[in-house]
Amino acid sequence: MVLKAVCVLRGAGETTGTVYFEQEGNANAVGKGIILKGLTPGEHGFHVHGFGDNTNGCISAGPHFNPASKKHAGPKDEDRHVGDLGNVTADANGVAKIDITDKISLTGPYSIIGRTMVIHEKADDLGRGGNEESLKTGNAGSRLACGVIGTE
């Protein structure tokens, strides 16, 4: 059985996006056809945050989804937040188009359903910034756009 989810990201500014997820059986979830627009060219941190709450804008989403109480790191690191998806890269027109496969899940205790995806202002330093904030947020800056992940 293939599970599907979708997230529509919006913010106070021009940044918008759509992420479609699929997961077959117990395999890792796949983000397909991710399109983010209205970004400055370059890298931007991309994370799943813990709460599905956007009542006060993206800040209500809380910290990165981290059910195992790990430190912030990059998507290729074994020891990291579940929500650490690394960076997306926007082209000269401010558009990022990517597909990702990650250790995230659409079922079980580490499910991302009902949580919030956030695109950040700056690049994520993947926990290698040499300060305490790097180990929490990757120094990725303000939250440009966000949306709650729901079943499709």
Curated annotation (Swiss-Prot):
Entry's EC annotation: 1.15.1.1
InterPro entries xrefs: SOD-like_Cu/Zn_dom_sf, SOD_Cu/Zn_/chaperone, SOD_Cu/Zn_BS, SOD_Cu_Zn_dom
SUPFAM superfamilies per the UniProt record, alphabetical: Cu,Zn superoxide dismutase-like
Binding site for Zn(2+): 64, 72, 81, 84
Lipidation feature positions (S-palmitoyl cysteine): 7
Pfam family, one: Sod_Cu
Main location: cytoplasm
Cofactor(s) for this UniProt protein: Cu cation; Zn(2+)
Subcellular location: Cytoplasm; Nucleus
GO cellular component terms attached to this protein's record: cytoplasm; nucleus
Any GO MF annotation of the entry: superoxide dismutase activity
Gene3D superfamilies noted in UniProt: Superoxide dismutase, copper/zinc binding domain
Cofactor note as given: Binds 1 copper ion per subunit. Binds 1 zinc ion per subunit.
Disulphide bond pairs: 58-146
Enzyme class at the top of the EC tree: oxidoreductase
Keywords annotated in UniProt: Antioxidant, Copper, Cytoplasm, Disulfide bond, Lipoprotein, Metal-binding, Nucleus, Oxidoreductase, Palmitate, Zinc
Positions annotated to bind Cu cation: 47, 49, 64, 120
Substrates-to-products reaction catalysed: 2 superoxide + 2 H(+) = H2O2 + O2
Entry keyword Lipoprotein: yes
Role: Destroys radicals which are normally produced within the cells and which are toxic to biological systems.
Similarity annotation: Belongs to the Cu-Zn superoxide dismutase family.
Subunit annotation: Homodimer.
Protein name: Superoxide dismutase [Cu-Zn]
